[in-house]
Every structure is written in structure tokens, then in C-alpha cells.
Design a protein with these regions (language model features):
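Bacterial N-terminal signal peptides
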Residues: 9-16
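Short, compositionally biased P/S/T/A/G/V-rich stretches that sit at domain boundaries
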Residues: 24-48
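A glycine-anchored, Pro-Gly-centered beta-turn/N-cap motif
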Residues: 49, 76, 114-116
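Short, well-structured beta-strand segments within conserved domains
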Residues: 51-55, 107-109, 116-124
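Short amphipathic, basic-aromatic surface patches that mediate peripheral association
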Residues: 56-71
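Short coil-to-beta strand junction motifs in C2/discoidin
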Residues: 67-78, 137
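Short acidic/polar inter-strand loop motif in beta-rich domains
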Residues: 87-90, 125-133
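Internal, hydrophobic beta-strand segments that form the core of beta-sheet-rich folds
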Residues: 114-128, 137-140
Length: 146
């Protein structure tokens, strides 16, 4: 019983410690001319059914999450915010149904969104899912699914 109680106490403490440490991660610099953008869909586009989203990037390279070391400077991976506000610049990017991570280096996805208006924004994160310094964000676009 005491071992189980110890685990119940220890696990949340370790999670809290890990999250606190993650929030203090250093931010990676990015080139001033780098930009992230949507290839598709276009701002204001009306789509029927599933939405093909293609990510564009210039001035930097794409690499999988967790990959660091020589040759990975100026790289990162995409995150897609769906119906979510812009991220805090100094925190690990969240991961849930509104914050999609593409940590394998993917540059496109297909979304199955409900009918209605939706906002999309790309955020380029470093190997640790932290925005670069300064953050590299796309324009926030609105689309309509019919």
C-alpha cells in the first residue's frame, strides 16, 4: 500500500518538475528572412469535405523533433494551430486536438474539420517543440468548411 501511495505521489511530482524544466529551455535563433506559410489552403478559401493543408517554409530547413547536434542549426518542424490563439513565445508548444505536431518532419496533412469557419496558423518549433527566437509564425488564416 505504501509503495502504491509513493508512486501516486512521485509520478505527479516528476511530471510537474519535467514541465517546469521544459519551460526553461533555451530558444534557438532563426534567420531574419525565414518565413513559414500556407501553400494550401488559401486565406478565405471555402472547402468541401476534408482539407488538404500544405506547409511552406523558406530560409530554414525541416528536421524531425528531438534531432540536435551538428548540421541541425536553422532547422525545426511544423506545428499547426487549429481554432487556437497564437502561442506563448517562451513555452513548449502544446499538443492536443487544437495544436497538431508534425515531429517526423511532415510538410502536409489532411484535416477532417466540422462544417463552419475555422482558423489555421503554422508555428515552426525547434527540436524541443519551442518556438524560435523570434518566433516563426505564419499569418493566421480563416477557411470555411461546407
Amino acid at each position: 500500500m505504501s509503495r502504491r501511495l509513493s508512486l501516486l505521489t512521485l509520478v505527479p511530482a516528476l511530471v510537474a518538475f519535467s514541465l517546469a524544466q521544459a519551460q526553461g529551455l533555451p530558444r534557438s535563433a532563426r534567420p531574419a528572412d525565414a518565413r513559414v506559410y500556407f501553400i494550401t489552403p488559401a486565406k478565405g478559401q471555402v472547402v468541401h469535405g476534408k482539407v488538404l493543408v500544405r506547409f511552406g517554409l523558406s530560409g530554414m530547413g525541416v528536421s524531425p523533433a528531438g534531432v540536435t547536434g551538428p548540421g541541425t542549426e536553422g532547422t525545426g518542424h511544423h506545428h499547426l494551430f487549429v481554432d487556437a490563439p497564437p502561442p506563448a513565445a517562451d513555452q513548449v508548444l502544446p499538443k492536443d486536438e487544437h495544436h497538431l505536431h508534425f515531429g517526423k518532419g511532415q510538410t502536409e496533412t489532411t484535416l477532417d474539420l466540422p462544417k463552419g469557419k475555422h482558423t489555421l496558423q503554422l508555428v515552426f518549433g525547434d527540436a524541443n517543440h519551442v518556438p524560435h527566437d523570434p518566433p516563426l509564425l505564419s499569418d493566421r488564416i480563416e477557411i470555411t468548411v461546407k
